[in-house]
Amino acid sequence: MADRQRDPDLADTLLLLEHPPVYTLGRGSSLDFIKFTPPASFTAGVTPSSRAEPTPPQPGPELHRTERGGEVTYHCPGQLVGYPILNLRRLSADLHWYLRQLEEYLIRVLDHYGLRGERI
């Protein structure tokens, strides 16, 4: 990753991997979406909202705040996750254009395997 920052002309890469059980919380997330009590170290400085009764922290998946948009995402073994790593400026400066292209490509791949994909 550091090499890519130094040289944006490196070839595009796709990372495919499985995560251990983990919840990631995007910028739009709230701890109200978590159905278990996170460890105190995770909630330090967070004002509780509508939780009626706090319960003791329970062992469970890891929690990580991220800089992505959206709310809460759960990743676990058996779930294949893909991370395209590329220089969008080389393709188009518009992130939404790229996402529509990626979406169309995945819909076509699904169709090739007899599965129906659609835009939401």
Swiss-Prot record:
Pathway this chain belongs to: Protein modification; protein lipoylation via endogenous pathway; protein N(6)-(lipoyl)lysine from octanoyl-[acyl-carrier-protein]: step 1/2
Role of this protein: Catalyzes the transfer of endogenously produced octanoic acid from octanoyl-acyl-carrier-protein onto the lipoyl domains of lipoate-dependent enzymes. Lipoyl-ACP can also act as a substrate although octanoyl-ACP is likely to be the physiological substrate.
Name of protein: Octanoyltransferase
Binding-site positions, substrate: 68-75
Catalytic activity: octanoyl-[ACP] + L-lysyl-[protein] = N(6)-octanoyl-L-lysyl-[protein] + holo-[ACP] + H(+)
InterPro entries: aa-tRNA-synth_II/BPL/LPL, BPL_LPL_catalytic, Octanoyltransferase, Octanoyltransferase_CS
Organism of origin: Prochlorothrix hollandica
PANTHER family documented for this protein: LIPOYLTRANSFERASE 2, MITOCHONDRIAL-RELATED, OCTANOYLTRANSFERASE
Leader sequence residues: none
GO molecular function: lipoyl(octanoyl) transferase activity
Localization, UniProt: Cytoplasm
Region feature Disordered, mapped onto this chain: 42-68
Record key words, sorted: Acyltransferase, Cytoplasm, Transferase
Enzyme Commission (EC) number: 2.3.1.181
UniProt similarity note: Belongs to the LipB family.
Pfam families: LplA-B_cat
Gene designation per UniProt: lipB
UniProt enzyme class: transferase
NCBIfam families: lipB
Domain BPL/LPL catalytic per the UniProt entry, residue ranges: 8-120
Cellular component aspect of the GO annotation: cytoplasm
Misc remark: In the reaction, the free carboxyl group of octanoic acid is attached via an amide linkage to the epsilon-amino group of a specific lysine residue of lipoyl domains of lipoate-dependent enzymes.
GO biological process terms held by the UniProt record: protein modification process
